[in-house]
């Protein structure tokens, strides 16, 4: 190994590091695994003055240090011709920087042309002495990092112009890392995902310049050279406390991270997983080496990250918390008209899980997302968003709301990339993440919130398990809330519907995913008609939620402004066969997406309820007199068997395993017991 490599350690330069050389050949660099790929014989003895590289990753730029007299206009062409072969010889290197410390030229080694950005030659100064002395400002480091990354991702043998790095979809990385953690540890799938998300947040915050120096992702990667335990100790004792400091806990005690595979419940390093931790870091670094930083994240990754991994989780399934497919969420959001609400409007998901309805509402409408742009270092959105989830003092119960907050960070990644000093981050934590999502530490969860200020819009998919609802009702009685839920029907979904209606403002709207069991309960139906205007009911196909074959519906209501108001307007009924993705374990995109046609029919209907005549065979406008006479709201039955066959609406028989069958029997038994109890109470 050369004396350079023995004596020199790389100098941190944002997410990269600078390696000062001079006497080291490319051949020696290859033997030290600093450069990858083969070398031609003619290139082996070439000696770069310095390199910019990812720690334990690839070389991104070659540095050539010259005297000022060597960088005159007359001599630059010959200097470029002589030294560009050094950078060309290094696989993946797309830029060579010539510098005298005061003046610099950024050159494409493949074409030997000066690199252009916004129509001008790139001459941003790279001063090796200032880099080694770590005398650069954060702004200067960020500018150099941005230029190096753009060159890495966009410069080629056919392109000399820099442009923004491409939008990144890290789904393959997330899947690979999740699989690795799951196979290695044997932990539940959702626990594995918590740790994927935590490392993702760590990498993202490093890439946007929030975590720098000793707190950065690159620093932890460098620590792995000294041992896996040392790297994990540094992460657990130094980095995680810094993330918690930057994003303080909310009143409920939760923040944006809480993985417990790489650390224990006390936050101490779990050395039994040090090797796995190092492997995961390397996976992230390899992805960065090939694709660039996490700064520009594809929206589809944001929207489907949690759904992809948690859809089949047994732990989630047993609680009835079926993750709503994002196509369904987005359709409900677009039907809601959230962007037209007045200033000061309140929007909620009272059973929010990882926050999909709230976050998709923010992401769908630019006018709403712009409300989260800081002004004078304060964030005061015009709308007030709330997401509630049930928990306890157990660490496992905190994780869903922590995921919701981390999910919000990912959704707002573009804003965090632009506004990321400590003051801004604390404001995002206090006024956005902690203000939006709340863990309710009680057996009642949301059902215990009876004095909440009412909402203009509620979008939700409440839990709809029947098993266990008797215990929940007992808790309601124990907390003297019987009167509040006196009119609720059977099952948790009926309690949820009672809460939703009670917590809407007069004139407020709700779009709710409900199961067929609710649509069969005459008591619930009558209560909804008494207190709300029924706008639409859309029948979703079986297996919309992969975890269950249960038939579900999108119920849309508007709370009456006058309790004596009688509905006269018709109701839009819509039947859906396909939701734009296969309804099996793969959930791959498919061409047919009836949800889009539902949105179109809904737009026309809401403009002119009495005059709308649908041409879509999946849509029906049911007069109020006819609708009011229905004893159940299984609206697909408004189509004849022949019509349903034509529309491919006849459901196939669903098979369930033994556990699923026992759950169905248990739920049915509890349902019957509640029904008998209701009848006896009415007769008493």
Where would I find each of the regions flagged by the language model?
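Long recognition/docking surfaces used for binding and targeting
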Residues: 201, 208-313
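Active-site metal-binding core of divalent-cation-utilizing nuclease and nuclease-like domains
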Residues: 7-57
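Conserved catalytic cores of phosphodiester-cleaving nucleases, focusing on short active-site segments
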Residues: 50-52, 59-69, 83
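Nucleic-acid nuclease catalytic cores
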Residues: 72-119
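Conserved S-adenosyl-L-methionine
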Residues: 324-453, 457, 465, 515-517, ...
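Domain-level recognition of nuclease-like catalytic cores that cleave nucleotide substrates
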Residues: 101-150
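A conserved structural/catalytic subdomain of Rossmann-like adenosyl-cofactor enzymes
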Residues: 71, 125, 129-134, 449-684
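Active-site-adjacent loop/helix micro-motif of nuclease/hydrolase catalytic cores
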Residues: 41-45, 61, 69-80, 582-583
